[in-house]
């Protein structure tokens, strides 16, 4: 196995597509304990492994059933997109086009689904704005290994945000669901808080707060990054292949879904290196790994493996296909027992006949003739990897 390039992660790593997949699927490799982020995510799903992980995941799978996915898309996402784009007509700027910060606009859209998924009862505009304030500090904790900020200060801000999120929004909704369970059961659509509030869950308040914080940042962060990257990459592709713009707008075509998957391969919205710790003596890629040792799955390298993507793998090309048969075309949602539970929200689910948040929102931007705004600068997050926090665009206003 090779050695990791970033100094902060000098651990053995796998880099080939096949070996990364095997590492992620290995049952004896658990997510590396993240001591720095423990106050914020220590007992959340992403930190669990083995029986505890399986039990938590089984209980939360109902949140991503076909019926639930259809409800999120039809009852929440679609009207939210219509209302958000219609509201742009009220902006006192160019009468034909509106200036939009793409990541912020998308985050506000996705936040509507996140609130329903978690089960937050207060959903007014002022409430959403307040919840929005918690997102960046919590994301910083989730990315703490790659942050260029002071980690102690970042974790302190995240812990404060999580505490306020719990006190102001989560705890009242959680107590209401606990009371409902005591009085005969929760009869409204399942949400995360109703699952955690079940007497059978064994969840304490701290764990409930951490799980809700995870769901907030995971649902918002992954989707926002994916959509921003897809809009940028598809815009460049359509400049070179103008006929494909019609395919982007065609909801009966799978072209846009392939664009989303290719964007996920070219620009993974996750950490470029997924760290695992051996829970027992194991073998990865034919190399022995001692219990307690740390190994890494280099997702970025795997996505550029010439054995799978021989033709300019760094280039965005939604028409490409892997050169060999593979289980999945990228590892941006992981693989194996820790495959992202919320993946169907982002890329859709054939069982539910949903196309996913990413394709739906990207199509809405192209239907509004999205264009990069060169008059305003782009800005990146304070991390060692590229993530937009400002990506200015303009869109046509529907009158």
Per-region residue spans from a language model:
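Cytochrome P450 substrate-recognition site 1
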Residues: 1-68, 132-144
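Conserved cytochrome P450 K-helix/beta-meander segment immediately N-terminal to the heme-binding cysteine loop
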Residues: 28, 298-325, 333
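Cytochrome P450 heme-thiolate monooxygenase catalytic core
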Residues: 71-225
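Short, mixed-charge aromatic SLiMs
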Residues: 130-147, 250-259, 321-324, 380-389
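Cytochrome P450 catalytic-core helices
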Residues: 209-214, 220-248, 342-369
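Conserved cytochrome P450 K-helix E-x-x-R motif and the immediately C-terminal K′/meander segment
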Residues: 249-287
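Cytochrome P450 heme-thiolate "Cys pocket" and heme-binding signature region
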Residues: 314, 320-391
């Amino acid at each position: 196995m090779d050695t990791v390039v970033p100094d902060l992660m000098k651990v053995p790593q796998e880099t080939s597509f096949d070996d990364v997949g095997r590492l992620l699927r290995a049952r004896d490799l658990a997510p590396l304990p993240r001591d720095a982020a423990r106050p914020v995510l220590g007992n959340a799903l992403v930190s669990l492994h083995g029986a505890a992980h399986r039990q938590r995941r089984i209980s939360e799978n109902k949140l991503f059933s076909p019926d639930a996915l259809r409800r999120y898309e039809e009852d929440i996402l679609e009207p939210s997109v219509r209302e958000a784009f219609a509201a742009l007509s009220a902006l006192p700027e160019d009468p034909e086009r509106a200036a939009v910060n793409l990541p912020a606009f998308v985050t506000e859209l996705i936040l509507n689904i996140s609130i329903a998924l978690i089960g937050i009862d207060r959903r007014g505009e002022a409430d959403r704005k307040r919840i929005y304030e918690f997102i960046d500090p919590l994301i910083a904790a989730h990315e703490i290994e790659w942050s260029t900020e002071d980690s102690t200060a970042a974790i302190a801000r995240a812990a404060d945000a999580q505490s306020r999120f719990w006190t102001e929004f989560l705890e009242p909704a959680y107590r209401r669901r606990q009371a409902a369970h005591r009085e005969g059961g929760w009869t409204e659509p399942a949400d995360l808080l109703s699952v955690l509030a079940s007497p059978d869950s064994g969840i304490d308040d701290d764990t409930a707060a951490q799980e809700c914080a995870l769901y907030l940042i995971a649902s918002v962060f992954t989707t926002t990054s994916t959509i921003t990257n897809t809009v940028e990459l598809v815009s460049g592709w359509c400049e070179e292949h103008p006929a494909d713009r019609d395919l982007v707008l065609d909801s009966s075509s799978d072209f846009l879904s392939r664009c989303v998957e290719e964007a996920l391969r070219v620009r993974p919205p996750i950490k470029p290196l997924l760290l695992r710790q051996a829970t027992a003596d194991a073998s990865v890629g034919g190399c022995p790994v001692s219990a307690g040792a740390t190994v890494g799955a280099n997702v970025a390298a795997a996505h550029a493996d010439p054995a799978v993507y021989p033709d300019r793998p760094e280039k965005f090309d939604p028409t490409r296909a892997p050169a060999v048969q593979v289980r999945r075309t990228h590892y941006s949602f992981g693989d194996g027992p820790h495959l992202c539970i919320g993946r169907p929200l982002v890329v859709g689910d054939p069982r539910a006949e949903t196309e996913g948040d990413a394709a739906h929102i990207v199509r809405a931007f192209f239907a509004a003739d999205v264009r990069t705004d060169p008059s305003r600068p782009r800005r990146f997050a304070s991390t060692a990897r590229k993530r937009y926090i400002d990506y200015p665009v303009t869109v046509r206003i529907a009158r």
